[in-house]
Swiss-Prot record:
Protein name (record): 4-diphosphocytidyl-2-C-methyl-D-erythritol kinase
UniProt keyword Kinase, yes or no: yes
GO biological process: isopentenyl diphosphate biosynthetic process, methylerythritol 4-phosphate pathway; terpenoid biosynthetic process
Catalytic activity, reaction form: 4-CDP-2-C-methyl-D-erythritol + ATP = 4-CDP-2-C-methyl-D-erythritol 2-phosphate + ADP + H(+)
Documented EC number(s): 2.7.1.148
Active site: K12, D122
UniProt-recorded Gene Ontology molecular function terms: 4-(cytidine 5'-diphospho)-2-C-methyl-D-erythritol kinase activity; ATP binding
Top-rank EC class of the record's enzyme: transferase
Keywords: ATP-binding, Isoprene biosynthesis, Kinase, Nucleotide-binding, Transferase
Protein task: Catalyzes the phosphorylation of the position 2 hydroxy group of 4-diphosphocytidyl-2C-methyl-D-erythritol.
Length: 273
């Protein structure tokens, strides 16, 4: 193991999330276009007995307990390390925070467990941390060609949302998947046009549980987003804008009128090779 290592845990964004079925064990089948952003949490490891320290603006929402995903990841890898998690993303927010953190621990430890999905359905895709089409229960990953640059604005209403509760509120579990194969996306407008034909099937049940999500979506649309959608099981929403300057202007506008919300502009994470 490296003596000291710092590993980014980039935010995950579900540009689409189609729920296409449910297995007999209760796990849902998904078809999702997933990308990663150039903002997120940061994991640092150092030699020592297994421990976890929490820093960052959202650290108060977590506890360094044995069931924390960072500690579980280290145990799954069979490694000891002093782990520090800089928590920059809201907790339970639909952008992969905990799963991305666990994946970052595994990468930092140079560990390749046989079943990373044992830590959570989003851990395999977060281990990849590159644009993919994700299917199955999250374990079937098809890498995508480089996508056009996107100007993203994230908005969270300041509250977490339980993933199991959102799935439980889902009215239909056998929705249509995305087309096969996916089209080419020569530019951002082609990708955004395709996204308008797709869905997040968890958006409606999440809004029923937390109406504030609809307010986030309305704020993004009012600020000029070309597409506004919820990510994952919520409550974070995202808007896609024509330029980085427009995304930053929308960030200032939305943050200025909604001081309790978390608002952050981002682009896509650099491609991994």
């Amino acid at each position: 193991m490296p003596l000291h290592r710092r590993e980014a845990a980039p935010a995950k964004l579900n540009l689409t999330l189609h729920v296409t079925g449910r297995r007999v064990d209760g796990y849902h089948l998904l078809d999702s276009l997933v990308v990663f952003l150039d903002l997120g949490d940061v994991v640092t490891i150092a030699p020592g007995p297994l421990s976890l320290s929490l820093t960052g603006p959202f650290a108060p929402g977590l506890a360094a307990e044995p069931d924390n995903l960072c500690l579980r990841a280290a145990r799954l890898a069979g490694r000891e390390a002093r782990i520090t998690l800089e928590k920059n993303l809201p907790v339970a927010s639909g952008i992969g925070g905990g799963s991305a953190d666990a994946a970052a621990v595994l990468r930092a430890l140079d560990a390749s467990p046989r079943r990373p999905e044992a830590l959570g359905a989003d851990v395999p895709v977060c281990l990849a941390s590159r644009p993919v089409r994700m299917r199955g229960v999250g374990e079937i990953l098809a890498p995508l060609p480089a996508l056009p640059e996107l100007n993203v604005l994230l908005v969270n209403p300041g509250r977490g949302l339980s993933t199991p509760a959102v799935f439980k509120a889902l009215a239909r579990h056998d929705n249509p998947p995305m087309p096969e194969p996916l089209p080419d996306f020569p530019d951002a407008q082609a990708l955004i046009g395709f996204l308008h034909e797709c869905r997040n099937d968890l958006e409606a049940p999440a809004i029923a549980l937390m109406p504030g999500i609809a307010d986030c979506l309305a704020a993004l649309r009012s600020a000029g987003a070309q597409l506004a959608r919820m990510s994952g099981s919520g409550a974070t929403c995202f808007g896609l804008f024509a330029s980085a300057a427009e995304a930053q202007a929308a960030r200032a506008r939305i943050a200025g009128t909604n001081p309790g919300w978390w608002v952050a502009a981002s682009g896509l994470a650099p491609a991994k090779h």
